[in-house]
């Protein structure tokens, strides 16, 4: 097989709809736009959310809440995800990113207690739930706050 012999899978490519090219094509005359009216015109149509003059849904529903600019975004990790580390490893935020457990850290990392921990680890992150700290220590490890 060579590069010039590559072809797309059968049925994966569809020819574009050629409208307004004569009645024999099946899409001549009005080109699929119906008869007259706003939608038949050049640039015609209504904006998203417009309901024909009726009070639209997004204006009928009340506003609610606000965005707290001081809110902290904590990245959560359950203890069962830590089993991919070797016994005796020091688990830091950088180690979690390196292993692909978390993508990025905004305002810190919190370890939660869902699942079981089978490895003895020294974990160094910002926060722990009570059950997570207990499980880390029960496995023979340490839960250190940084």
UniProtKB/Swiss-Prot annotation:
SUPFAM superfamilies membership: Ribosomal proteins L15p and L18e
GO function terms (MF aspect): rRNA binding; structural constituent of ribosome
Protein name: Large ribosomal subunit protein uL15
Pfam families found in the cross-reference section: Ribosomal_L27A
Annotated source species: Clostridium acetobutylicum (strain ATCC 824 / DSM 792 / JCM 1419 / IAM 19013 / LMG 5710 / NBRC 13948 / NRRL B-527 / VKM B-1787 / 2291 / W)
Annotated Gene Ontology cellular component terms: cytosolic large ribosomal subunit
Self-association state and partner proteins as the record states: Part of the 50S ribosomal subunit.
Gly residues: bias regions: 21-31, 42-52
Keyword vocabulary terms for this entry: Ribonucleoprotein, Ribosomal protein, RNA-binding, rRNA-binding
One of the GO biological process terms: translation
HAMAP family: Ribosomal_uL15 (MF_01341)
Coiled coil: none
